[in-house]
Design a protein with these regions (language model features):
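Catalytic-site microenvironment of enzymes
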Residues: 1-249
């Protein structure tokens, strides 16, 4: 009997030991899972946050070109040349910010065919076709202004009268223009329902009239690379501000 009691006691101790060991192993498993699961979750969050954003595309339209010189400045500068130079500077500015840029023209070559009867209309249609093909997020057409009174000056942005996004983009660029020019620029954004590009553009488009070639002081400035770069920077900053506000950047 004594031997039986001893054996029973040993069996009881063994069972207790096994249970304690099992509990210990279970606790280790729970602790290890508690450690591994957050790490896996964190890794997943990090992977999601590194998904690259969609590359944005901005179309830049340098107005006029080839046989169409646009306005001729009081100092004989040609609008088409100033438009192209400013557009190139805007392109350079935006590309440094990671924006994809498409231009309707990068030199003075015509956008129409020599056989086209209405070359101006063919030119406008070609610009619209480029916009359609590149599927840009927004479009900015660069021009210079003119008026009968030489005293009138200052940059101004036009947008399509029924375009909510166009109005926002115009306001953003106009604000940037005002910072470049200063308080003396009293011009404000203006709706329009007649300009061909504004009416037919498949995306929000604005027309930036960068200054008046009929104003001697402004015409001289617009012919200089330094001022062209300042105007281009204002356009670029206005574009970036609009894209940021619309949560596209």
């Amino acid at each position: 009997m004594g031997n039986v009691n001893i054996l029973e006691k040993r069996m009881i101790k063994y069972e207790v030991s096994v249970k304690q060991t099992a509990k210990f192993i279970m606790m280790l498993l729970i602790l290890s899972l508690a450690y591994v699961m957050p790490a896996a979750t964190t890794k997943k969050i990090q992977q999601v946050s590194t998904v690259p954003k969609k590359t944005l595309t901005v179309l830049l339209d340098a107005g006029h070109g080839a046989d169409d010189s646009g306005k001729v400045g009081i100092n004989q500068v040609l609008e088409k040349d100033i438009n192209l130079e400013i557009a190139k500077y805007v392109k350079e500015f935006l590309e440094k910010e990671g924006i994809n840029v498409v231009m309707t023209r990068e030199d003075d070559s015509p956008l129409y065919q020599s056989s086209d009867r209405n070359k101006k209309l063919a030119d406008m249609k070609k610009r619209i076709q480029i916009m359609v093909d590149c599927d840009a997020d927004i479009a900015v057409s660069i021009h210079q202004n003119s008026y009968t009174q030489e005293s009138v000056k200052g940059p101004q942005v036009f947008y399509y009268k029924d375009s909510v996004e166009g109005k926002k983009l115009a306001a953003s660029i106009q604000e940037a223009f005002d910072l470049v020019i200063g308080d003396e620029n009293t011009r404000t954004i203006k709706p329009n329902g007649e300009y061909y590009l504004l009416v037919h553009s498949p995306m929000p488009l604005v027309i930036c009239e960068c200054g008046f070639l009929s104003n001697w002081e402004e015409a001289k400035l617009l012919a200089t690379p330094t001022y062209q770069k300042s105007i281009a920077k204002a356009i670029g900053q206005g574009i970036l501000e609009y894209l940021a506000n619309e949560k596209r950047l």
